[in-house]
Amino acid sequence: DAGLTQDPWHFDTTTPSYGPGASMLDRLPANAPRQQVLPDEYRKASDEELQQRISDAKQRLGSKLLILGHFYQRDEIIKHADFVGDSFQLAKNATERPDADHIVFCGVHFMAETADILSTPEQSVTLPNLSAGCSMADMANIDQVQECWDQLGEICGTQPDSDGLQQIIPVTYMNSSAALKAFCGRNGGIVCTSSNAHAVLEWAFARGKRVLFFPDQHLGRNTARAMGIPLSEMPLWDPFKAQG
């Protein structure tokens, strides 16, 4: 993708985007947040001036500021990060600095939301670019999941069976919105990472007859296959088709 070598200001737009390298087939949510164009004083500043302004701000704020940088960020961002890692690691890092009043998460929506969930009420979490979305997290939104849940409830029922097993246990991947994580919490479900997906599915099947896994169909399918569950028992619900 030629966009990977273009200057960052090329993507300074109010139009939501997954950025350079993203698949043209990825659907952006209609209600995706829009980023305001940055003031000219930043756009016209040299790289050296911008770097100095960041360094000065860090020095001035000291321990009150925590900058988290995802692995995918450019080097000129990573150099200022207090912690660098994947989304799960950075979410844990956010809890290690309760003295930080301001957490700047250089990542995408769901990452900043997760840090906000784990932070204290006194801390603020800032996402520098509001249009920084994740196509994986956007593969399922709360309205789609709720519709699927309601339809499955009509088919499978909503009451536990005679053994006390729930009809369906919702499981969401870490790369999902706060709304989906909250949905799982309300409905007896759980959040998983790629490394503990197997253990989480074992936990879920010990408590329920079925699992509704979202938004990453491949993580759910591959983990279930490794557990010996046949593909014939893994239907895919498509929100863009009647009755899924």
Where are these regions (language model features)?
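The feature marks the mature, well-folded catalytic cores of soluble enzymes
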Residues: 3-244
